[in-house]
Amino acid sequence: MSTQDLEASMRKSVEATQRNFNTIRTGRANSSLLDRISVEYYGAETPLKSLATLSTPDSQTIQIQPFDISALASIEKAIAMSELGFTPNNDGKIIRINVPPLTEERRKEFCKLASKYAEEGKVALRNLRRDAIDKIKKQEKEGEFSEDQSRDEQDGVQKTLDKFIAELEKHLASKEADILKV
């Protein structure tokens, strides 16, 4: 595995963790909160994003305008059944969700969830490091690398890991600051 391949894989892990962070509520309304909601539409589970336009007209409201009005009831039901705890308001054409301010207890829960996502991201990064080091050791056994080259390559892999873990920690700190901001 080349350094570029390793960095690309690690970048994808960090981006996946960032997408997970985006699904966590902060004090403001954000349409990405609804990214994981699937709607029963003509017998198939369909992502909400492909059934409606999502917007945030103000900091406390998410607005959902379905492309097909017949999907309105299904969308409303899916949002009400989700673990987000939102109560959708349906006016016959548009669904509005008022995002209430977070309580201190909920903020702490969301910080714990963000930490959990960050830890999962770190585990994924460490697994990539382990795979890369195993390949290097295998190449050393096969005679492609000398012992010194192998050690240098392993040090490079570790430095790459450290860089991406620091980036992940920075994203986590930023998300926690967003969550805790009143």
Curated annotation (Swiss-Prot):
InterPro entries: Ribosome_recyc_fac (IPR002661), Ribosome_recyc_fac_dom (IPR023584), RRF_sf (IPR036191). GO terms for molecular function: ribosomal large subunit binding. It is found in: Cytoplasm. GO terms for biological process: translational termination. CDD domains: RRF. Keywords: Cytoplasm, Protein biosynthesis. Pfam families: RRF. GO terms for cellular component: cytoplasm. Responsible for the release of ribosomes from messenger RNA at the termination of protein biosynthesis. May increase the efficiency of translation by recycling ribosomes from one round of translation to another. Belongs to the RRF family. This is Ribosome-recycling factor. The lineage of its organism: Bacteria, Bacillati, Cyanobacteriota, Cyanophyceae, Synechococcales. The gene is frr.
